[in-house]
Amino acid sequence: SGQIQLWQFLLELLSDSSNANCITWEGTNGEFKMTDPDEVARRWGERKSKPNMNYDKLSRALRYYYDKNIMTKVHGKRYAYKFDFAGLAQAMQPVQADPSMYRYQSDLTYLPGYHPTKLNFVGTPINPSTNASLFSSHSSYWSSPTGANIYPSGHVTHPHASHMSSHIGTYYG
């Protein structure tokens, strides 16, 4: 998502030593401590335009990261957490496309930097309301007699649906 995530916000605070009054690194293994957890929560609430944010709510959000292997609680230390940078890097990986949605792998070779094991394609849904404006202008070019009959047989071929991703049907038809 385009919105800042809590873990990104915490790293942002930790990257500036002037925030040591509320959050600071402890050691070199990704461990950090909230020296003023209420202030960290207040700043997070300010950033997200949520004035009712408090440490209880922020810590609930942090617990969500445990299952995602993004961070863990440091046992025996109050307000201490540890980033799992390997898990964080894994969580940041884009969704991998299913190569079977293409009829031939050679169809993908035109993509710059394409490598079968490093395919980072994410399909973007098409919004019909924005596309309508692309075709709604009636310029003299398209209304000319030669432009009106660009397909002499009047037939347009369509790709076979068998190799298309199943979500395409929700946008067309």
Curated annotation (Swiss-Prot):
SMART domains tied to this protein: ETS
GO BP term (any one): cell differentiation
GO molecular function, one term: DNA-binding transcription factor activity, RNA polymerase II-specific
Pfam families linked: Ets
PROSITE patterns linked: ETS_DOMAIN_1 (PS00345), ETS_DOMAIN_2 (PS00346), ETS_DOMAIN_3 (PS50061)
DNA-binding region per Swiss-Prot/TrEMBL record: 1-84
Cysteines paired by S-S bonds: none
Mitochondrion is among the record's keywords: no
InterPro entries reported in the protein's UniProt record: Ets_dom, ETS_fam, WH-like_DNA-bd_sf, WH_DNA-bd_sf
GO CC list: nucleus
Keywords: Activator, DNA-binding, Nucleus, Transcription, Transcription regulation
Protein's cellular compartments: Nucleus
Family: Belongs to the ETS family.
Listed name of the protein: Transcriptional regulator ERG homolog
Organism in which the protein naturally occurs: Lytechinus variegatus (Green sea urchin)
Gene name linked to the record: ERG
